[in-house]
Amino acid sequence: MKKFIFILASIYFAAGQFACADEFQKVRCGADIPKALIGQRGPVQRIVVLEKKHAALGLKHMGADEISDRLSSINWMICGAEFMVLVERGGLVSDAVPFPEHSKASPAFSGLCQSKGKDLPDIYVGVLDGASKADLLPVVTAWKIDKQRAKFIKVPGEGLLCPRSGIYTVDGGL
């Protein structure tokens, strides 16, 4: 009987810890944040609850974008730096990258881009060079989102142009 109670108690406490776990439980400032996030699964929680729970990390939700019916990108401020995370429909973090600083002069964007005058079929995220007043802006830093593998793929910015309409941050506005 004691063994049965011990096993039951062990299952209860293990399940309780699992239920409280989220994608930020392994994150530590000064450590490899993308590595700590990838493979974690987050429960559906209100953002303010997550931010309060992980206040020591300076956690702040910076916005999200639906990439496909099974994949979203979410920007988080963690330990004073911005990170972009790919999250699958079930809450699994499939990839994460440090996202570069952006501003009105170098705005963040997400969307379709062009190369050599032709539209590219993939979705790109990154930072643009906002110095020009043109509708298409050159890329400073970018990743292509591989929707099948749910991964960020770093791409060279040379020759890549993205529309001003893809700018999504208040610091870079239209």
Model-found features: residue ranges?
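Exposed acidic/polar residues on beta-strands and adjacent loops within beta-sheet cores, strongest
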Residues: 20-174
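Sec-dependent N-terminal signal peptides
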Residues: 4-14
